[in-house]
């Protein structure tokens, strides 16, 4: 009888620890979408930098 109580207590302890240690997956991914948009904008600005410099120098030569 005592062994059954100890076994059930250990089982309940393991069950409780396994439920609390698992990290839930975030349900709202809106911040990841905002971060991706910001990354795309930043990359677009970095890629457009040399083209803007060429246009500026061509405009200066044309004057």
Curated annotation (Swiss-Prot):
Highest expression in fat body and hemocytes. Is also expressed in Malpighian tubules and to a much lesser extent in midgut. Not present in silk gland. GO terms for cellular component: extracellular region. The modification 5-hydroxylysine is found at residue 47. One of its GO terms (biological process) is antibacterial humoral response. Residues 23-26 form a propeptide. The modification Isoleucine amide is found at residue 61. Residues 1-22 form the signal peptide. Belongs to the cecropin family. This is Cecropin-B. It comes from Bombyx mori.
